[in-house]
Amino acid sequence: MYTDLKDKVVVITGGSTGLGRAMAVRFGQEEAKVVINYYNNEEEALDAKKEVEEAGGQAIIVQGDVTKEEDVVNLVQTAIKEFGTLDVMINNAGVENPVPSHELSLDNWNKVIDTNLTGAFLGSREAIKYFVENDIKGNVINMSSVHEMIPWPLFVHYAASKGGMKLMTETLALEYAPKGIRVNNIGPGAMNTPINAEKFADPVQRADVESMIPMGYIGKPEEVAAVAAFLASSQASYVTGITLFADGGMTKYPSFQAGRG
């Protein structure tokens, strides 16, 4: 646990399910004030809010579409109005869907880029604007992926969004480091989240994915949440501009694990 996270105001986009929910609950355990953004499932968001409160934190929910500038502005302003400030912005909302690249429509491409990359930029921009204007040494955490460095056939739009996020985060980190504002990525590997539930329920598909992970198991959302808590804390005060992978070693060329090559 990180005592300095108590009463910190943390905004999480896509915070009602999956990795976002796990992070919301972890910050609840840290006794933070959590702003849970959700897209359209209010019941799910209210359940997440209750879980955060039961964990020891405070929470509000804010509906919004991260691809819409006005919604992201409203999200940040609502957090500030409700809790008086902003300390940590976590841009977690994301989408993915497999399509052969030669069949990928422009609408599909735009949906993924707009959600994963533009949404993260808008969240980063609004948070940093507030930090700069109020001389706050704030913290931005962007949810990237192992696919910011590993090519992913059938997911060219997703891989492009995460590759773009890598350099966006590094650029923002460099630009605002003199003001004490830290910007980092988390790069999850394969995770036991609702979006993967059907796939991992199939023993064959699960074993295939596990074979690509040197540590041999699919990650738990709580393991990503632990990384987020670390990056948000003063224990990471000298850390900026990195991607911290929580991937069980997936990015470390697992095919070479047995000495092959």
Swiss-Prot record:
Pfam families registered for this protein in UniProt = adh_short_C2
Residues reported to bind substrate: S145
Q: Which GO terms describe its molecular function?
A: glucose 1-dehydrogenase (NAD+) activity; glucose 1-dehydrogenase (NADP+) activity; identical protein binding
- Recorded superkingdom: Bacteria
Disulphide-bridged cysteine pairs: none
Quote the InterPro entries the UniProt record gives.
NAD(P)-bd_dom_sf, Sc_DH/Rdtase_CS, SDR_fam
What positions does the entry give for NAD(+) binding?
Answer: 11-35
Q: What is its EC number?
A: 1.1.1.47
- What reaction does this catalyse? D-glucose + NAD(+) = D-glucono-1,5-lactone + NADH + H(+); D-glucose + NADP(+) = D-glucono-1,5-lactone + NADPH + H(+)
What's in the keyword line of the UniProt record? NAD, Oxidoreductase
- Positions annotated as active site in the UniProt record: Y158 (proton acceptor)
Keyword Acetylation carried by entry: no
User: How would you summarize the oligomeric state and partners of this protein?
Assistant: Homotetramer.
Question: Beyond the main fields, what else does the record say?
Answer: Prefers NAD to NADP; 2M NaCl enhances its pH and thermostability.
Query: What protein family does this chain belong to?
Result: Belongs to the short-chain dehydrogenases/reductases (SDR) family.
Protein's UniProt name: Glucose 1-dehydrogenase 4
Species, as recorded:
Priestia megaterium
